[in-house]
Amino acid sequence: MVTAGYPGQYGKPVLIRRSNPADIPEIASLEAEAFIDPWGEEGLREAMNNYLTSFFVAVADGMIIGFCGGGIENTGDIVYGHLCTLAIRPQYRQQGIGSELVATIEHDFLLLGATAVELEVRISNRDAIAFYRRLGYRAVFCYTRYYKDGEDGVVMMKWFAS
């Protein structure tokens, strides 16, 4: 699945496409900039091979400027998408790229039979919580000491209209 290019920074087109193994080093570099506890190249490779059914990158000027990844969860009662990771290079934020990536992965989850999407976000990451709220996500509960450093994680969900 590829989203047609749309104007990004300074009107340069941004292309959203499925990622491939060759993207891992560049994704890992961006991930290290964005997160306190990045998965790293090996963790990304393992996740892509074993769990992340949906992984997309945003590309501008031949460079990966953002990515998102997730997989499908099936409890037996409900099938939902799990948005595991999303990051945008700082200079490309506030331009709609994150929203486009989330819309792309949500569409993929829907095609795979999901009725909702779940994600976790650090309780201190107010910008991310506000971003997901704008996209229709709602906080449903909190994991105590969810992250390696002991920070709590807010679980947010969005249900697709039936």
Describe each PLM feature range.
Residues 85, 89-103, 110-112, 116, ...:
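Conserved glycine-rich acetyl-CoA-binding loop
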Residues 2-6, 115, 122-126, 135, ...:
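C-terminal "cap" of GNAT-fold acetyltransferases
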Residues 44, 142-143:
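Short beta-alpha junctions and helix-cap segments that line functional grooves
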Residues 48, 110, 127, 149-150:
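Short secondary-structure boundary/hinge segments and terminal tails
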Residues 2-3, 9-10, 18-91, 102-104, ...:
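Acetyl-CoA-dependent GNAT
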Residues 75, 143-144:
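Short, Lys/Arg-rich nucleic-acid/phosphate-binding segment
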Residues 39, 78, 96, 127, ...:
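Residues that form or flank phosphate/diphosphate-binding pockets in enzymes
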